[in-house]
Amino acid sequence: LNFLTEPLPESKRKKLLKLVASNLNRSHGIVCISEFVRHDLEQHRDLFQISEETPITVVHNGIFLPEEGQISGITRDPIVPNAPYLLALGVLYEKKQQHLLVPALCHLPEELHLVLIYSEAKSEYLSKIQRMIQQYRLEDRVHLLCAVSDVEKASLLQHCRALLQPSIAEGFGLPVVEAMALGKPIFLRPATSLPEVGGDVAYYFDEVSPEAIAGTILSGLSAYDMSPSQTEALRARARLFDYRRMAQGYLQFYHEILPI
């Protein structure tokens, strides 16, 4: 439901509202991918004309969790920087807030790089990030990678120091689960659905000044490095989002809703 709060032309917002409402108010049941989304939808039942009789339930997204042998078998792809790096993964939209990571890099050790993977981008936001990279003279430390393959993405996740997700608008956050499944430390914005996914194994950006972000990353990496059990704690958290649990959730929902 991001379109309700995003800075969109009013004509487009009305068009989206009509489209979403026409789907929701004819449904016999609705599945949300997080408790955050369910709460948001419950708050807008009247707006979407959803009957009070229509059940709204939650089935978290799930992934195929890698086995131990698969993790150790992920090789270092040539696309991976030849330096320790932090990773951010997602579309380059203003709501994802990746631009906050660029000035923060100035307050981190020079040997640490930043990799931004994106599948698509708003041209003005991509230009904004590129200008910031030039402004802070970080051309050699920030890597923008568009539309990487699944093999490349797996390698970039496996060899990163940590995953960073400073977004202020998430319905779920699959990259967080993908990183946890590999035992990688995760740094999240305490907003929307992200705390629901990261739980108590994540580190959170409570403040987003460059110095505060860098401080959170440094203290989190230090704590992670000094706690060998943290890797297994992250993997255990990821197991809550196994695709089999997701499938079972949908199966149960269909049994409750459909006359089968």
Role assignments for model-derived ranges:
Residues 1-260:
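Carbohydrate transferase catalytic cores enriched for Leloir-type hexosyltransferases
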